[in-house]
Amino acid sequence: MAIHKALVMCLGLPLFLFPGAWAQGHVPPGCSQGLNPLYYNLCDRSGAWGIVLEAVAGAGIVTTFVLTIILVASLPFVQDTKKRSLLGTQVFFLLGTLGLFCLVFACVVKPDFSTCASRRFLFGVLFAICFSCLAAHVFALNFLARKNHGPRGWVIFTVALLLTLVEVIINTEWLIITLVRGSGEGGPQGNSSAGWAVASPCAIANMDFVMALIYVMLLLLGAFLGAWPALCGRYKRWRKHGVFVLLTTATSVAIWVVWIVMYTYGNKQHNSPTWDDPTLAIALAANAWAFVLFYVIPEVSQVTKSSPEQSYQGDMYPTRGVGYETILKEQKGQSMFVENKAFSMDEPVAAKRPVSPYSGYNGQLLTSVYQPTEMALMHKVPSEGAYDIILPRATANSQVMGSANSTLRAEDMYSAQSHQAATPPKDGKNSQVFRNPYVWD
Protein backbone atom coordinates (compact mmCIF):
# COMPACT_ATOMS: atom_id res chain seq x y z
CA MET A 1 0.00 0.00 0.00
CA ALA A 2 2.84 2.35 0.85
CA ILE A 3 4.51 1.53 -2.44
CA HIS A 4 1.30 2.40 -4.32
CA LYS A 5 1.02 5.83 -2.66
CA ALA A 6 4.65 6.57 -3.39
CA LEU A 7 4.14 5.70 -7.08
CA VAL A 8 1.13 7.99 -7.36
CA MET A 9 3.05 10.87 -5.80
CA CYS A 10 5.97 10.36 -8.19
CA LEU A 11 3.68 10.40 -11.22
CA GLY A 12 1.69 13.41 -10.03
CA LEU A 13 4.68 15.49 -9.02
CA PRO A 14 5.56 16.59 -12.62
CA LEU A 15 1.99 17.76 -13.15
CA PHE A 16 2.21 20.09 -10.16
CA LEU A 17 5.71 21.29 -11.05
CA PHE A 18 4.99 21.76 -14.75
CA PRO A 19 1.32 22.74 -15.23
CA GLY A 20 2.07 23.64 -18.83
CA ALA A 21 2.55 20.01 -19.68
CA TRP A 22 -1.09 19.34 -18.78
CA ALA A 23 -2.27 22.24 -20.95
CA GLN A 24 -0.20 21.14 -23.91
CA GLY A 25 -1.58 17.66 -23.58
CA HIS A 26 -5.15 18.98 -23.89
CA VAL A 27 -5.07 21.08 -27.03
CA PRO A 28 -8.59 22.08 -28.11
CA PRO A 29 -9.80 20.75 -31.46
CA GLY A 30 -8.81 22.96 -34.35
CA CYS A 31 -5.58 24.27 -32.79
CA SER A 32 -2.04 23.07 -33.45
CA GLN A 33 0.25 21.59 -30.81
CA GLY A 34 2.78 24.41 -30.82
CA LEU A 35 0.24 27.24 -30.52
CA ASN A 36 0.39 29.52 -27.51
CA PRO A 37 -2.54 28.78 -25.15
CA LEU A 38 -3.27 32.51 -25.18
CA TYR A 39 -4.77 32.16 -28.68
CA TYR A 40 -6.78 28.98 -28.19
CA ASN A 41 -10.10 30.86 -28.46
CA LEU A 42 -9.26 31.86 -32.03
CA CYS A 43 -9.21 28.26 -33.24
CA ASP A 44 -11.19 26.31 -30.64
CA ARG A 45 -14.01 24.53 -32.46
CA SER A 46 -15.57 23.31 -29.23
CA GLY A 47 -16.34 26.92 -28.26
CA ALA A 48 -17.33 28.41 -31.61
CA TRP A 49 -17.98 31.92 -30.29
CA GLY A 50 -14.34 32.90 -30.87
CA ILE A 51 -14.29 31.72 -34.49
CA VAL A 52 -17.63 33.40 -35.25
CA LEU A 53 -16.58 36.73 -33.77
CA GLU A 54 -13.26 36.48 -35.57
CA ALA A 55 -15.04 36.06 -38.91
CA VAL A 56 -17.48 38.89 -38.18
CA ALA A 57 -14.67 41.23 -37.17
CA GLY A 58 -12.58 40.31 -40.23
CA ALA A 59 -15.49 41.07 -42.56
CA GLY A 60 -16.01 44.37 -40.76
CA ILE A 61 -12.36 45.35 -41.18
CA VAL A 62 -12.47 44.71 -44.92
CA THR A 63 -15.78 46.55 -45.33
CA THR A 64 -14.64 49.58 -43.34
CA PHE A 65 -11.37 49.78 -45.25
CA VAL A 66 -13.18 49.71 -48.61
CA LEU A 67 -15.67 52.36 -47.48
CA THR A 68 -12.82 54.59 -46.33
CA ILE A 69 -11.17 54.37 -49.74
CA ILE A 70 -14.48 55.11 -51.48
CA LEU A 71 -15.14 58.13 -49.27
CA VAL A 72 -11.68 59.60 -49.81
CA ALA A 73 -11.77 58.90 -53.57
CA SER A 74 -15.14 60.64 -53.91
CA LEU A 75 -13.74 63.94 -52.62
CA PRO A 76 -13.15 65.45 -56.13
CA PHE A 77 -16.72 64.57 -57.13
CA VAL A 78 -18.47 66.22 -54.18
CA GLN A 79 -20.35 69.21 -55.60
CA ASP A 80 -21.94 70.44 -52.38
CA THR A 81 -19.44 72.37 -50.26
CA LYS A 82 -21.51 71.79 -47.12
CA LYS A 83 -21.15 68.02 -47.48
CA ARG A 84 -17.48 68.37 -48.31
CA SER A 85 -16.88 70.07 -44.97
CA LEU A 86 -18.06 66.90 -43.19
CA LEU A 87 -15.72 64.48 -44.97
CA GLY A 88 -12.86 64.92 -42.50
CA THR A 89 -15.08 64.06 -39.55
CA GLN A 90 -16.56 61.08 -41.38
CA VAL A 91 -13.11 59.68 -42.21
CA PHE A 92 -12.19 60.06 -38.53
CA PHE A 93 -15.36 58.15 -37.67
CA LEU A 94 -14.37 55.35 -40.04
CA LEU A 95 -10.97 55.07 -38.38
CA GLY A 96 -12.67 54.68 -35.01
CA THR A 97 -14.97 52.00 -36.42
CA LEU A 98 -11.98 50.17 -37.88
CA GLY A 99 -10.36 50.23 -34.44
CA LEU A 100 -13.48 48.70 -32.86
CA PHE A 101 -13.34 45.75 -35.23
CA CYS A 102 -9.66 45.25 -34.46
CA LEU A 103 -10.30 45.41 -30.71
CA VAL A 104 -12.61 42.39 -31.02
CA PHE A 105 -9.54 40.17 -31.42
CA ALA A 106 -8.13 41.50 -28.13
CA CYS A 107 -11.32 40.41 -26.40
CA VAL A 108 -11.37 36.98 -28.04
CA VAL A 109 -7.88 35.96 -26.97
CA LYS A 110 -7.29 35.02 -23.35
CA PRO A 111 -6.46 37.87 -20.98
CA ASP A 112 -2.93 38.88 -20.07
CA PHE A 113 -1.30 42.20 -19.24
CA SER A 114 -1.18 43.57 -22.81
CA THR A 115 -4.66 42.44 -23.86
CA CYS A 116 -6.28 43.69 -20.66
CA ALA A 117 -4.53 47.06 -20.92
CA SER A 118 -5.69 47.47 -24.52
CA ARG A 119 -9.26 46.55 -23.56
CA ARG A 120 -9.44 48.98 -20.63
CA PHE A 121 -7.90 51.88 -22.52
CA LEU A 122 -9.00 51.49 -26.15
CA PHE A 123 -12.58 50.43 -25.43
CA GLY A 124 -13.56 53.88 -24.18
CA VAL A 125 -11.26 55.82 -26.54
CA LEU A 126 -12.51 54.17 -29.74
CA PHE A 127 -16.15 54.56 -28.77
CA ALA A 128 -15.41 58.17 -27.82
CA ILE A 129 -14.05 58.77 -31.35
CA CYS A 130 -17.24 57.45 -32.96
CA PHE A 131 -19.67 59.19 -30.61
CA SER A 132 -17.71 62.46 -30.77
CA CYS A 133 -17.93 62.42 -34.58
CA LEU A 134 -21.67 61.80 -34.36
CA ALA A 135 -22.05 64.66 -31.86
CA ALA A 136 -20.04 67.00 -34.11
CA HIS A 137 -22.16 65.97 -37.10
CA VAL A 138 -25.32 66.71 -35.13
CA PHE A 139 -23.86 70.08 -34.16
CA ALA A 140 -23.39 70.95 -37.84
CA LEU A 141 -26.78 69.54 -38.87
CA ASN A 142 -28.64 71.86 -36.50
CA PHE A 143 -27.10 74.85 -38.27
CA LEU A 144 -27.71 73.42 -41.73
CA ALA A 145 -31.33 72.50 -41.02
CA ARG A 146 -32.15 76.04 -39.87
CA LYS A 147 -29.87 78.35 -41.88
CA ASN A 148 -28.63 76.09 -44.70
CA HIS A 149 -25.17 77.27 -43.72
CA GLY A 150 -23.05 75.41 -41.19
CA PRO A 151 -19.60 75.77 -39.65
CA ARG A 152 -16.50 75.07 -41.64
CA GLY A 153 -14.94 71.65 -41.94
CA TRP A 154 -11.97 72.32 -39.67
CA VAL A 155 -14.31 73.58 -36.95
CA ILE A 156 -16.38 70.38 -37.05
CA PHE A 157 -13.28 68.20 -37.00
CA THR A 158 -11.80 70.20 -34.12
CA VAL A 159 -14.96 69.71 -32.07
CA ALA A 160 -14.82 65.95 -32.61
CA LEU A 161 -11.11 65.84 -31.80
CA LEU A 162 -11.46 67.84 -28.58
CA LEU A 163 -14.32 65.66 -27.36
CA THR A 164 -12.17 62.59 -28.01
CA LEU A 165 -9.15 64.03 -26.18
CA VAL A 166 -11.24 64.39 -23.05
CA GLU A 167 -11.85 60.63 -22.96
CA VAL A 168 -8.17 59.96 -23.69
CA ILE A 169 -7.18 62.01 -20.64
CA ILE A 170 -9.83 60.37 -18.46
CA ASN A 171 -8.84 56.83 -19.43
CA THR A 172 -5.13 57.52 -19.03
CA GLU A 173 -5.51 58.94 -15.53
CA TRP A 174 -7.97 56.24 -14.49
CA LEU A 175 -5.75 53.40 -15.67
CA ILE A 176 -2.61 54.86 -14.07
CA ILE A 177 -4.30 55.64 -10.77
CA THR A 178 -5.89 52.19 -10.61
CA LEU A 179 -2.63 50.35 -11.23
CA VAL A 180 -0.59 52.53 -8.86
CA ARG A 181 -3.18 52.26 -6.11
CA GLY A 182 -3.42 48.50 -6.51
CA SER A 183 0.33 48.00 -6.42
CA GLY A 184 0.67 50.27 -3.38
CA GLU A 185 -1.97 48.47 -1.35
CA GLY A 186 -0.49 45.04 -2.06
CA GLY A 187 -3.70 43.31 -1.10
CA PRO A 188 -5.30 40.43 -2.97
CA GLN A 189 -7.64 42.64 -4.92
CA GLY A 190 -9.00 41.16 -8.09
CA ASN A 191 -11.83 40.28 -10.32
CA SER A 192 -14.32 37.58 -9.57
CA SER A 193 -13.41 35.82 -12.79
CA ALA A 194 -9.70 35.40 -12.13
CA GLY A 195 -7.19 35.81 -9.34
CA TRP A 196 -4.83 38.24 -11.02
CA ALA A 197 -2.06 40.23 -9.38
CA VAL A 198 -2.97 43.56 -7.93
CA ALA A 199 -0.97 45.67 -10.41
CA SER A 200 -2.43 43.94 -13.46
CA PRO A 201 -5.08 45.76 -15.53
CA CYS A 202 -7.06 42.53 -15.57
CA ALA A 203 -7.66 42.90 -11.82
CA ILE A 204 -10.10 45.78 -12.34
CA ALA A 205 -13.66 44.94 -11.36
CA ASN A 206 -16.42 44.96 -13.94
CA MET A 207 -18.32 47.73 -12.18
CA ASP A 208 -15.25 49.96 -12.15
CA PHE A 209 -14.74 49.40 -15.85
CA VAL A 210 -18.32 50.45 -16.60
CA MET A 211 -18.08 53.52 -14.36
CA ALA A 212 -15.02 54.66 -16.30
CA LEU A 213 -17.20 54.88 -19.43
CA ILE A 214 -19.63 57.49 -18.08
CA TYR A 215 -18.22 60.22 -20.33
CA VAL A 216 -18.68 57.98 -23.39
CA MET A 217 -22.29 57.42 -22.38
CA LEU A 218 -22.79 61.17 -22.13
CA LEU A 219 -21.46 61.59 -25.68
CA LEU A 220 -23.87 58.93 -26.90
CA LEU A 221 -26.77 60.56 -25.09
CA GLY A 222 -25.86 64.01 -26.46
CA ALA A 223 -25.71 62.74 -30.04
CA PHE A 224 -29.04 60.98 -29.61
CA LEU A 225 -30.83 64.01 -28.18
CA GLY A 226 -29.18 66.48 -30.56
CA ALA A 227 -30.43 64.61 -33.63
CA TRP A 228 -34.07 65.37 -32.83
CA PRO A 229 -34.00 69.16 -33.39
CA ALA A 230 -32.32 68.62 -36.76
CA LEU A 231 -35.49 66.88 -37.94
CA CYS A 232 -37.55 70.04 -37.36
CA GLY A 233 -35.48 72.47 -39.42
CA ARG A 234 -36.76 74.57 -42.29
CA TYR A 235 -34.50 72.97 -44.89
CA LYS A 236 -35.88 69.49 -45.31
CA ARG A 237 -33.04 68.06 -47.36
CA TRP A 238 -30.93 67.74 -44.19
CA ARG A 239 -33.53 65.68 -42.35
CA LYS A 240 -32.39 62.39 -43.83
CA HIS A 241 -28.91 62.94 -42.39
CA GLY A 242 -30.50 63.52 -39.01
CA VAL A 243 -32.43 60.28 -39.44
CA PHE A 244 -29.18 58.42 -40.10
CA VAL A 245 -27.62 59.74 -36.89
CA LEU A 246 -30.78 59.13 -34.89
CA LEU A 247 -31.09 55.53 -36.05
CA THR A 248 -27.41 54.87 -35.33
CA THR A 249 -27.49 56.34 -31.83
CA ALA A 250 -30.76 54.59 -30.94
CA THR A 251 -29.26 51.23 -31.94
CA SER A 252 -26.12 52.01 -29.96
CA VAL A 253 -28.14 52.87 -26.86
CA ALA A 254 -29.92 49.51 -27.06
CA ILE A 255 -26.62 47.64 -27.48
CA TRP A 256 -25.01 49.45 -24.56
CA VAL A 257 -27.90 48.77 -22.24
CA VAL A 258 -27.78 45.05 -23.03
CA TRP A 259 -24.05 44.55 -22.66
CA ILE A 260 -23.77 46.61 -19.46
CA VAL A 261 -26.55 44.58 -17.82
CA MET A 262 -24.95 41.31 -18.91
CA TYR A 263 -21.44 42.41 -17.92
CA THR A 264 -22.27 43.72 -14.45
CA TYR A 265 -25.28 41.65 -13.40
CA GLY A 266 -26.20 38.78 -15.72
CA ASN A 267 -22.93 36.86 -15.75
CA LYS A 268 -22.59 37.07 -11.98
CA GLN A 269 -26.12 35.81 -11.39
CA HIS A 270 -25.60 32.81 -13.66
CA ASN A 271 -22.17 32.07 -12.14
CA SER A 272 -20.50 32.35 -15.54
CA PRO A 273 -17.68 34.90 -15.21
CA THR A 274 -15.95 33.36 -18.21
CA TRP A 275 -18.53 35.09 -20.42
CA ASP A 276 -17.15 38.53 -19.58
CA ASP A 277 -14.80 38.51 -22.54
CA PRO A 278 -17.43 37.26 -25.05
CA THR A 279 -19.80 39.95 -23.80
CA LEU A 280 -17.31 42.72 -24.59
CA ALA A 281 -16.43 41.18 -27.97
CA ILE A 282 -20.09 40.86 -29.00
CA ALA A 283 -20.79 44.45 -27.94
CA LEU A 284 -17.85 45.72 -30.00
CA ALA A 285 -18.76 43.79 -33.14
CA ALA A 286 -22.49 44.57 -32.93
CA ASN A 287 -22.01 48.30 -32.36
CA ALA A 288 -19.36 48.59 -35.08
CA TRP A 289 -21.63 46.93 -37.63
CA ALA A 290 -24.45 49.24 -36.55
CA PHE A 291 -22.17 52.18 -37.37
CA VAL A 292 -21.41 50.75 -40.81
CA LEU A 293 -24.95 49.80 -41.78
CA PHE A 294 -26.93 52.72 -40.36
CA TYR A 295 -24.52 55.62 -40.74
CA VAL A 296 -21.48 55.03 -42.97
CA ILE A 297 -23.15 53.38 -45.98
CA PRO A 298 -26.07 55.89 -46.15
CA GLU A 299 -23.70 58.84 -45.84
CA VAL A 300 -21.38 57.52 -48.55
CA SER A 301 -24.36 57.07 -50.88
CA GLN A 302 -25.44 60.70 -50.31
CA VAL A 303 -22.06 62.42 -50.45
CA THR A 304 -21.89 62.90 -54.24
CA LYS A 305 -25.46 64.11 -54.72
CA SER A 306 -25.81 67.77 -55.64
CA SER A 307 -27.89 70.24 -53.70
CA PRO A 308 -31.23 71.57 -55.05
CA GLU A 309 -29.65 75.00 -55.57
CA GLN A 310 -26.98 73.55 -57.84
CA SER A 311 -29.56 71.53 -59.76
CA TYR A 312 -31.59 74.70 -60.37
CA GLN A 313 -28.55 76.59 -61.59
CA GLY A 314 -27.67 73.69 -63.87
CA ASP A 315 -31.09 73.94 -65.49
CA MET A 316 -30.79 77.70 -65.94
CA TYR A 317 -27.23 77.70 -67.22
CA PRO A 318 -26.34 74.31 -68.65
CA THR A 319 -22.71 73.51 -69.08
CA ARG A 320 -21.56 73.53 -72.71
CA GLY A 321 -19.01 70.92 -73.50
CA VAL A 322 -16.67 71.17 -76.44
CA GLY A 323 -17.21 68.20 -78.71
CA TYR A 324 -18.48 66.97 -82.03
CA GLU A 325 -22.00 66.34 -80.73
CA THR A 326 -22.25 69.86 -79.32
CA ILE A 327 -21.16 71.37 -82.65
CA LEU A 328 -23.74 69.32 -84.55
CA LYS A 329 -26.47 70.44 -82.16
CA GLU A 330 -25.50 74.09 -82.59
CA GLN A 331 -25.43 73.79 -86.39
CA LYS A 332 -28.78 72.03 -86.37
CA GLY A 333 -30.26 74.78 -84.25
CA GLN A 334 -28.91 77.47 -86.54
CA SER A 335 -30.18 75.75 -89.69
CA MET A 336 -33.60 75.35 -88.17
CA PHE A 337 -33.64 79.05 -87.33
CA VAL A 338 -32.62 80.08 -90.86
CA GLU A 339 -35.04 77.75 -92.64
CA ASN A 340 -37.98 78.90 -90.56
CA LYS A 341 -38.95 82.03 -92.56
CA ALA A 342 -42.52 82.32 -91.39
CA PHE A 343 -41.75 85.37 -89.27
CA SER A 344 -38.71 86.72 -91.11
CA MET A 345 -38.57 90.25 -92.59
CA ASP A 346 -39.05 90.84 -96.31
CA GLU A 347 -35.55 91.66 -97.36
CA PRO A 348 -33.76 90.99 -100.65
CA VAL A 349 -31.98 87.70 -100.65
CA ALA A 350 -28.96 89.14 -102.42
CA ALA A 351 -28.37 91.52 -99.56
CA LYS A 352 -28.24 88.62 -97.10
CA ARG A 353 -26.27 86.17 -99.20
CA PRO A 354 -23.56 87.61 -101.49
CA VAL A 355 -23.17 85.53 -104.64
CA SER A 356 -19.71 84.25 -105.41
CA PRO A 357 -18.39 84.74 -108.98
CA TYR A 358 -17.51 81.05 -109.01
CA SER A 359 -20.93 79.82 -107.94
CA GLY A 360 -21.87 78.73 -111.49
CA TYR A 361 -18.67 76.82 -112.10
CA ASN A 362 -19.30 73.08 -112.09
CA GLY A 363 -15.77 71.84 -112.65
CA GLN A 364 -16.03 71.33 -116.47
CA LEU A 365 -13.84 73.00 -119.09
CA LEU A 366 -15.22 75.99 -120.93
CA THR A 367 -14.40 74.46 -124.34
CA SER A 368 -16.82 71.64 -123.78
CA VAL A 369 -19.81 74.01 -123.87
CA TYR A 370 -20.52 76.12 -126.99
CA GLN A 371 -21.19 79.76 -126.13
CA PRO A 372 -21.66 81.98 -129.24
CA THR A 373 -20.40 85.55 -129.19
CA GLU A 374 -22.25 88.63 -130.39
CA MET A 375 -20.44 88.69 -133.77
CA ALA A 376 -21.36 85.06 -134.39
CA LEU A 377 -24.98 85.84 -133.75
CA MET A 378 -24.80 88.79 -136.21
CA HIS A 379 -23.36 86.63 -139.02
CA LYS A 380 -26.06 84.00 -138.57
CA VAL A 381 -28.80 86.51 -139.43
CA PRO A 382 -30.36 85.79 -142.93
CA SER A 383 -29.16 88.21 -145.65
CA GLU A 384 -32.61 88.87 -147.11
CA GLY A 385 -33.82 90.45 -143.93
CA ALA A 386 -33.76 94.15 -143.28
CA TYR A 387 -30.63 95.10 -141.41
CA ASP A 388 -32.36 98.14 -140.01
CA ILE A 389 -34.91 95.95 -138.37
CA ILE A 390 -32.40 93.42 -137.10
CA LEU A 391 -29.84 95.99 -136.02
CA PRO A 392 -31.75 99.23 -135.62
CA ARG A 393 -30.13 102.56 -136.25
CA ALA A 394 -29.13 104.44 -133.19
CA THR A 395 -31.02 107.68 -132.62
CA ALA A 396 -30.52 110.54 -130.26
CA ASN A 397 -32.63 109.27 -127.41
CA SER A 398 -32.40 110.81 -124.01
CA GLN A 399 -32.72 107.48 -122.32
CA VAL A 400 -29.94 106.00 -124.45
CA MET A 401 -27.70 109.04 -124.00
CA GLY A 402 -28.24 109.10 -120.29
CA SER A 403 -27.57 105.43 -119.89
CA ALA A 404 -24.11 104.34 -118.95
CA ASN A 405 -24.64 100.82 -120.25
CA SER A 406 -23.33 99.89 -123.71
CA THR A 407 -25.75 97.01 -124.12
CA LEU A 408 -28.92 97.64 -126.14
CA ARG A 409 -32.13 97.32 -124.29
CA ALA A 410 -35.55 96.28 -125.59
CA GLU A 411 -37.08 99.73 -125.36
CA ASP A 412 -34.15 101.21 -127.31
CA MET A 413 -34.67 98.74 -130.12
CA TYR A 414 -38.40 99.50 -130.26
CA SER A 415 -37.84 103.27 -130.47
CA ALA A 416 -35.28 102.83 -133.26
CA GLN A 417 -37.67 100.67 -135.30
CA SER A 418 -40.48 103.18 -134.98
CA HIS A 419 -38.18 106.00 -136.08
CA GLN A 420 -37.08 104.11 -139.22
CA ALA A 421 -40.66 103.37 -140.12
CA ALA A 422 -41.63 107.03 -139.88
CA THR A 423 -38.69 108.28 -142.05
CA PRO A 424 -39.31 107.94 -145.87
CA PRO A 425 -36.54 106.62 -148.09
CA LYS A 426 -34.41 109.19 -149.95
CA ASP A 427 -34.38 107.62 -153.41
CA GLY A 428 -37.98 106.46 -153.29
CA LYS A 429 -36.99 102.84 -153.42
CA ASN A 430 -37.13 100.18 -150.87
CA SER A 431 -33.41 100.07 -150.54
CA GLN A 432 -31.71 98.19 -147.82
CA VAL A 433 -28.78 100.03 -146.32
CA PHE A 434 -26.65 98.67 -143.58
CA ARG A 435 -26.25 101.18 -140.80
CA ASN A 436 -24.02 100.67 -137.84
CA PRO A 437 -26.05 101.19 -134.70
CA TYR A 438 -22.97 102.30 -132.82
CA VAL A 439 -22.24 105.27 -135.18
CA TRP A 440 -24.35 108.37 -134.87
CA ASP A 441 -25.65 110.26 -137.94
Curated annotation (Swiss-Prot):
Protein name, entry field: G-protein coupled receptor family C group 5 member C
Glycan-linked positions: N191
Region (Disordered): 412-441
Superkingdom of source: Eukaryota
Gene: GPRC5C
Family from the record: Belongs to the G-protein coupled receptor 3 family.
Transmembrane segments: 51-71, 86-106, 121-141, 156-176, 209-229, 242-262, 280-300
Keyword Cell membrane: yes
Membrane topology: Multi-pass membrane protein
GO cellular component: centriolar satellite; cilium; cytoplasmic vesicle membrane; extracellular exosome; intracellular membrane-bounded organelle; plasma membrane; receptor complex; vesicle
Entry's Gene Ontology BP terms: G protein-coupled receptor signaling pathway
Expression induction: By all-trans retinoic acid (ATRA).
Residue numbers bearing the Phosphoserine modification: S344, S383, S403, S406
InterPro entries for this protein: GPCR_3_C, RA-inducible_GPCR3
The species this protein was found in: Homo sapiens
Cytoplasmic topological segments: 72-85, 142-155, 230-241, 301-441
Leader sequence segment: 1-23
Cellular location(s): Cell membrane; Cytoplasmic vesicle membrane
Extracellular side: 24-50, 107-120, 177-208, 263-279
Modified residue annotations for Phosphothreonine: T423
GO function terms (MF aspect): G protein-coupled receptor activity; protein kinase activator activity
Keywords for this protein: Cell membrane, Cytoplasmic vesicle, G-protein coupled receptor, Glycoprotein, Membrane, Phosphoprotein, Receptor, Signal, Transducer, Transmembrane, Transmembrane helix
Taxonomic lineage: Eukaryota, Metazoa, Chordata, Craniata, Vertebrata
